[in-house]
Amino acid sequence: MKVLAAMSGGVDSSVAAARMVDAGHDVVGVHLALSTVSGTLRTGSRGCCSKEDVSDARRVADVLGIPFYVWDFAEKFQEDVIDNFVSAYARGETPNPCVQCNQRIKFSALSVRALMLGFDTVATGHYARLSGGRLRRAVDRGKDQSYVLAVLTAQQLRHAAFPIGDTLKRQVRAEAARRGLLVADKPDSHGICFIPSGNTRAFLSECIGIRRGSVVDADGTVLAEHDGVHGFTVGQRKGLGIVGPGPNGRPRYVTAIDADTATVYVGDAADLGVHTLIGRAPVFTAGAAPLGPVQCVVQIRAHGETAVAVVELIGDELFVRLCEPLRGVARGQTLVLYRLDPDGDEVLGSATIASMSA
């Protein structure tokens, strides 16, 4: 089988590529240049597409004895991931850029090019498993990335491989060391790759500019002014610009955002719970949509809590009724569905949260 191994320069993708070589496949390594800034440098465990990352990926490819190329996807990454990220925050939403990158870049643009060039599969270092064409959680639950892959279609998954999904992270590092790969102890990447400073609010402010509005409570009392709704997300407690707690002595949280009026609403923690969600643009990883209401497990953050819910597809929207409330649910988040069984590791599908109610 002809395999294109996506190599970021990190330990996970390096071991994934090595395993595909060991399996006897015809492997070619490729590094995706996603930054429009020439010579971008890594800042500790933050940043992406740095000169160090390219060099590390190339050295691993040399050790493995496979061809290696750098493909420039910077313009498409800017349009499909960064610009969408900024636009979503300007609308008062809370998107996950890793979800968008997987859906639009790694398993769309990259996969399409790979198939056009005659490759059968794109292998990545994601912590997830494929079994019988079904996407499942990784063995290492602490590193599981099935959440950010749940937007992939059955067709996309047919041409994907996740060689390290059955392995614990510490075992991956140990294997890299045994293979003599210099990335064995390289720090994991954290945060949003295109915001190496880690300051999302500053990044968004630079992109969007100042759009002043008010922070108000449930009674409509103005508590503070702000420079843009992009600096807030539902569930946020710090950085609200409010002095002191609420009149009941309890902390205040962002409970809702109205981008049209530039209003940020705050309230008690009790105001954060929601029981009903509506998701748009649903994707079902196994291909077929569920027939009628189905009980499953839902998750709204990459490593967040889960909850049992009854889900039903009505038209082109996903209606979700939670058995227990979830807190801090925001528009724009990815809602992922898992099969309700003892393992709870099979992904059924996903949608983008369009609205929610208590």
Swiss-Prot record:
Organism: Mycobacterium leprae (strain TN)
Enzyme class: transferase
Keyword line: ATP-binding, Cytoplasm, Disulfide bond, Nucleotide-binding, RNA-binding, Transferase, tRNA processing, tRNA-binding
Region (Interaction with tRNA): 143-145
GO cellular component, one term: cytoplasm
Catalytic site positions: 101 (nucleophile), 193 (cysteine persulfide intermediate)
Protein name: tRNA-specific 2-thiouridylase MnmA
Catalytic reaction list: S-sulfanyl-L-cysteinyl-[protein] + uridine(34) in tRNA + AH2 + ATP = 2-thiouridine(34) in tRNA + L-cysteinyl-[protein] + A + AMP + diphosphate + H(+)
Principal location class: cytoplasm
Gene3D superfamilies per UniProt: Adenine nucleotide alpha hydrolases-like domains, HUPs, Translation factors
This protein's encoding gene: mnmA
Family: Belongs to the MnmA/TRMU family.
Site (Interaction with tRNA): 126, 333
Binding site for ATP: 6-13, 32, 125
EC number: 2.8.1.13
